[in-house]
């Protein structure tokens, strides 16, 4: 209450009392006048007390406001001086925001500059083979039916202060991409996953994206990465057309630039063009040791990989992608005990229910270096999608190990694939410029008995070939086999997180016993498999 209001109230009370006093005096009542004076005195005391209390409250409020303003100014000054906060300005809002983009639990600060999200994928395969060895000398004589938890990954991804990105993802799957086989000591497995490796760390990296040169986005990253060096590898396993990638692309990637790979490098991209290069080491699934027995292993390898790709044409309902890549094994793994430097090129028959590799060069001796070069093409026209890659491999065998064969000539291998799909429900594959590859399908009408949607349905076909034979008929040749596989697929995208994949494969694998022995040890097979996929 203001001083003027107190004064007005006092004047009114005094006037009223004065009137009453005059009336009492006219009546001659002295006692009543005395009582009224006493009441007036008490009211004056109360008014003085209220006025003093109001003035004190106003002073306290003004002091608190001044203190708050000073604290805000000091906090802003400290924040602006900190190197962790590059942009000067007011204090960012406090609190967190919880969201579920594509059903992925995500927590961010209110300014969106710091986030952490949980990510996971489950790929569970069941299937069987009709396997037919050409002769009794063929190895193997049968392939096992059954199931395989192909991938079972869970981890966290996020960012700090907008530009620092990270991921930590572990794979509990039964035949993960980076698992190269169980090592052993004197024929006894050395205590890790059957058919697996010493580590299931699929991603553990840090990436900086603060630089944006030439109107694009630059990512500088290092750690354990999924390297988008081939078109097939740049496509997420959640988005590939078939349960497995083509053998030619798998062999090209696993030489130096697949996932689970230790690497450091950079990639630049905009809406049209992508370019990247990395220096690479071993995968987390490899044992690198100077000893051959304790534990079994070899020294670390050194490699490098580059890729340039882009969407050269795009418009309403259509797109065309072209690209090329190259990978270099600069320093192969070296066994410090035996002196051996070897390289093996091999793959499973585009299905991993049974992990047997039907084509393999075996351990190529005296490898000093190796290279592979690839060309890629992909595109869309409405619901139609196509993709293809072809690879050429060179293996140099002039390492000075002192082991036979000495002075062996260079080896050459090659292979590729072509695949296409048609989405029966009309959706199209969208382009992902950050990886220079295509996303999978997101159904326009997710399956729902209540809502009447049936998801998205896609039919697909692929033919792939890989030739691991060279210099047959000579002592320095390699008889790794030649594999051709025809695959038909049906994909049901239930919603943005669940997919079912049905694949039928027909394979022909002609192979001879060795480079100098033409005895038939080839095989043929048919296989049917179903994948249940959950991802977020």
Spans of model-derived segments:
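Outer membrane beta-barrel
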Residues: 89, 100-332, 412-452, 456-473
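Short, surface-exposed charged micro-motifs
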Residues: 97, 265, 376
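Bacterial N-terminal signal peptides that target proteins for export
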Residues: 1-9
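N-terminal periplasmic/intermembrane-space "pro-region" immediately following the signal or transit peptide
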Residues: 13, 23-123, 130-137, 209, ...
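Residue-level detection of beta-strand scaffold positions
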Residues: 53, 60, 67, 114-119, ...
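Acidic-residue sensor for enzyme active/binding pockets
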Residues: 32, 44, 72, 202, ...
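N-terminal signal peptide c-region/cleavage motif recognized by signal peptidases
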Residues: 19-21
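Outer-membrane beta-barrel pore domains
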Residues: 188-193, 208, 326, 336-536
């Amino acid at each position: 209450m203001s001083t003027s209001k107190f004064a007005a109230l006092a004047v009114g009370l005094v006037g009223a009392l004065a009137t009453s006093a005059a009336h009492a005096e006219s009546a001659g009542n002295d006692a009543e006048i005395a009582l009224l004076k006493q009441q007036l005195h008490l009211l004056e005391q109360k008014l003085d007390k209220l006025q003093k209390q109001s003035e004190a409250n106003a002073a306290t409020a003004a002091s608190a406001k001044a203190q708050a303003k000073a604290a805000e100014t000091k906090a802003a000054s400290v924040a602006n001086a900190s190197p962790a906060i590059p942009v000067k300005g007011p204090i960012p809002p406090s609190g967190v925001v919880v969201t579920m983009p594509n059903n992925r639990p995500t927590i961010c600060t209110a300014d969106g500059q710091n986030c952490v999200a949980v990510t996971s994928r489950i790929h569970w395969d069941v299937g069987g083979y009709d396997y037919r060895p050409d002769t009794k000398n063929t190895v193997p004589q049968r392939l096992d039916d059954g199931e395989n938890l192909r991938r079972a990954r869970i981890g966290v991804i996020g960012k700090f202060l907008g530009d620092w990105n990270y991921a930590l993802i572990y794979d509990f799957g039964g035949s993960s991409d980076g698992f190269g086989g169980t090592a052993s000591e004197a024929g006894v497995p050395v205590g890790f996953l059957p058919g697996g490796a010493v580590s299931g760390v699929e991603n553990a990296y840090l990436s900086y994206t603060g630089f944006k040169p030439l109107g694009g986005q630059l990512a500088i990253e290092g750690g354990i990465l999924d390297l988008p060096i081939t078109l097939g590898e740049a496509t997420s396993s959640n988005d590939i057309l078939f349960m497995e990638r083509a053998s030619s692309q798998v062999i090209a990637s696993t030489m130096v630039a697949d996932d689970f790979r230790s690497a450091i490098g950079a990639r630049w991209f905009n809406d049209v063009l992508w370019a990247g290069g990395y220096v690479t080491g071993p995968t987390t699934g490899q044992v690198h040791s100077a000893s051959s027995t304790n534990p079994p292993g070899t020294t670390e390898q050194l490699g490098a990989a580059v890729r340039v790709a882009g969407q050269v044409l795009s418009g309403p309902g259509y797109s065309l992608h072209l690209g090329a890549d190259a990978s270099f094994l600069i320093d192969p793994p070296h066994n410090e005990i035996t002196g051996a430097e070897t390289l093996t090129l091999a793959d499973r028959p585009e299905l991993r229910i049974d992990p047997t590799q039907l084509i393999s060069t075996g351990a190529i001796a005296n490898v000093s270096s190796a290279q592979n070069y690839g060309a890629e093409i992909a595109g869309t026209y409405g619901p139609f999608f196509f993709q293809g890659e072809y690879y050429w491999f060179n293996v140099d065998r002039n390492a000075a190990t002192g082991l036979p064969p000495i002075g062996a000539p260079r080896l050459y291998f090659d292979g590729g694939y072509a695949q296409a799909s048609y989405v029966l429900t009309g959706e199209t594959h969208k382009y992902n410029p950050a990886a220079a590859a295509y996303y999978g399908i997101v159904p326009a009408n997710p399956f729902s008995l209540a809502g009447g949607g049936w998801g998205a349905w896609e039919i697909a076909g692929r033919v792939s070939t890989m030739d691991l034979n060279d210099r047959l008929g000579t002592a320095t040749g390699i008889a790794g086999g030649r594999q051709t596989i025809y695959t038909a697929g049906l994909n049901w995208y239930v919603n943005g997180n669940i997919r079912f994949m049905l694949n039928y494969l027909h394979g022909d694998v002609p192979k001879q016993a060795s480079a100098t022995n033409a005895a038939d040890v080839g095989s043929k097979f048919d296989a049917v498999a179903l994948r249940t996929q959950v991802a977020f």
